[in-house]
Amino acid sequence: LVKPSEDVLEEIKYLNFDYYQVYDCSPEEIRYIKEKYRKKIISAITIENSQDLNNYKDFLPFSEIILFDSKGYEKSMSFNHKLLEDMPSNFKKMIAGNIKIDDILNFKNKEYIIDVSGGLEDISGKKSKSKIDKFLNEINKVWN
């Protein structure tokens, strides 16, 4: 949900979602959504450089998961995931930003939830079955 309006939130409130993944909202807006709609929250923090990293702290009280994504999240852009290496381990982290099959080994010893959405597409918005199969095979090789 990208800065969801009250109308959108009202329309989807009866759908059986466990989490709302929310972009471009302030911590206060996240708190409001969490309290009113009683959903678990994935708060997206966009990262371009190291100065953006500490923005997550304001969202922690209202978020079950913090998603670190690139500034161009709608365009499947990437950011330097190594910026996250010194982050504290006391909260759940999700990473996105055009993660591709070849990137999997970089995350082997990390406690990240990985959003590979754009990295598994041949055409923007359309997943590739062969890329999904290759990704799952790579995951099995790395963790087995």
Which residues make up each language-model segment?
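Catalytic beta/alpha-barrel core
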Residues: L1-P4, V8-K34, K39-D58, E64-M77, ...
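Surface-exposed amphipathic alpha-helices with a cationic face
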Residues: I12, I30-R38, L84-P88, D133-W143
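Short, glycine/charged-enriched secondary-structure capping and boundary segments
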Residues: Y14, E35-K36, Y56-D58, N80-L83, ...
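Conserved, mostly hydrophobic/aromatic
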Residues: Y20, I66, N80, L84, ...
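Glycine-rich phosphate-binding active-site loops on the catalytic face of alpha/beta enzymes
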Residues: Y23-E28, K71-K75, K110-D133
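A generic structural signal for ordered secondary structure
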Residues: K40-I42, N106-F107, I113
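A C-terminal functional module that forms or caps the active site or interfaces directly
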Residues: M94-N106, E121
